[in-house]
């Protein structure tokens, strides 16, 4: 029974690590899925895939990096694989559904403007190349350049430079009139 107890101990540790990750990063994982997939059904599938792969990955977690870095590394890898798979099937991305935002107490117009701005920003982020999307989503999740570099394989200096460049591109595109077709930063 020593082998069975060892397996159960491994599963328990895997479950504990997954539970910790979910407690700390659950909402961030949902935001990440939203940044990579506009279609609500595909986003649910992506989110489930992220959670499943994350749970599986804890079999190999060795604490050489922080839990946060591990979670984002796995989640971004799954999301990028999803994008590649979707592009191979030539499926057209659909518009992002209305974001779940807390109601603005000021007035209905400012709440509507905020939702429109968030939708516009999400659409622009979705048009970025996967690596740039990964960098900006990490930035928006308040990860430092070193942590983002661990996830992406870029140097912290390269991450900082990309963040600056992406922010400038997004700001410029955000203030331009909406254009149909074409991918930004590709």
Each PLM stretch: what is its role?
Residues 2, 89-114, 144:
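Internal acidic/polar
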Residues 73-94, 114:
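Arg/Lys-rich amphipathic alpha helix in sigma70-family domain 2
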Residues 76, 146, 150-177:
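DNA-recognition helix of helix-turn-helix
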């Amino acid at each position: 029974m020593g082998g069975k107890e060892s397996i159960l101990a491994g599963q328990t540790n895997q479950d504990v690590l997954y539970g910790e990750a979910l407690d700390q990063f659950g909402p961030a994982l949902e935001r990440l899925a939203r940044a990579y997939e506009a279609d609500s059904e595909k986003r649910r599938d992506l989110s489930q895939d992220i959670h499943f792969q994350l749970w599986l990955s804890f079999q190999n977690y060795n604490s050489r990096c922080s839990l946060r870095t591990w979670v984002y590394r796995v989640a971004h890898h799954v999301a990028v694989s999803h994008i590649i798979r979707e592009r191979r099937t030539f499926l057209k991305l659909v518009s992002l559904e209305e974001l779940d935002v807390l109601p603005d107490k000021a007035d209905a117009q400012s709440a509507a403007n905020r939702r429109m701005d968030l939708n516009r920003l999400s659409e622009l982020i979705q048009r970025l190349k996967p690596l740039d999307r990964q960098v900006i989503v990490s930035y928006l999740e308040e990860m430092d350049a070193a942590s983002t570099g661990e996830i992406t394989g870029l140097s912290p200096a390269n991450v900082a430079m990309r963040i600056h460049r992406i922010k400038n591109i997004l700001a410029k595109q955000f203030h331009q009139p909406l254009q149909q077709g074409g991918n930004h930063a590709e």
